[in-house]
């Protein structure tokens, strides 16, 4: 008589958000004076948005009771947008920064993108990435 035995390894994943925070700055209107007697309103729009989220993820192998491995990762994204109007024309730029901790081979990754328009019609864009 031949007995055959087999087992199935099951890996269970669980993920739950731990912390989430938001910060938003509303636009504002400034009043400036170029010379006495003349008033001109300058619209300056500042916008800032920050999102931070922490996720705790764990993996467990049912065939090995000592295989519990908690993993924690943090994700942060910041978007800033600023517009200015001056004698040389309008100036606006937008910056977006994203950083993740606990992910990837090195455990940390960071990327930043900056773009905008300078007075005179000059456009610029900058991107950086770090692992």
Swiss-Prot record:
This is Protein anoxia up-regulated. Residues 1-121 are annotated as: Disordered. Keywords: Stress response. One of its GO terms (biological process) is response to anoxia. The keyword Metal-binding does not apply. It comes from the Eukaryota. Concentrated in lamina neurons, first optic lobe neurons and cortical neurons of central brain. Plays an important role in the regulation of tissue responsiveness to oxygen deprivation. It comes from Drosophila melanogaster (Fruit fly). 'fau' is an acronym for 'fly, anoxia, up-regulated'. Residues 1-24 have a biased composition (Polar residues). Induction: By anoxia. Coiled coil: none annotated. Residues 44-53, 98-116 have a biased composition (Low complexity). The keyword Nuclease does not apply.
């Amino acid at each position: 008589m031949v007995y055959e035995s087999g087992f199935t390894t099951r890996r269970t994943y669980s993920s739950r958000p731990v912390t989430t925070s938001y910060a938003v700055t509303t636009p504002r209107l400034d009043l400036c004076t170029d010379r006495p007697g003349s008033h001109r309103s300058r619209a300056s729009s500042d916008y800032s948005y920050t999102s931070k989220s922490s996720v705790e993820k764990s993996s467990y192998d049912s065939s090995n009771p000592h295989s519990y491995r908690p993993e924690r990762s943090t994700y942060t994204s910041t978007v800033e947008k600023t517009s200015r109007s001056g004698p040389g024309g309008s100036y606006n730029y937008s910056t977006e920064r994203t950083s993740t901790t606990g992910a990837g081979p090195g455990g940390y990754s960071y990327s930043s993108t900056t773009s905008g328009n300078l007075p005179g019609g000059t456009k610029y864009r900058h991107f950086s990435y770090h692992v």
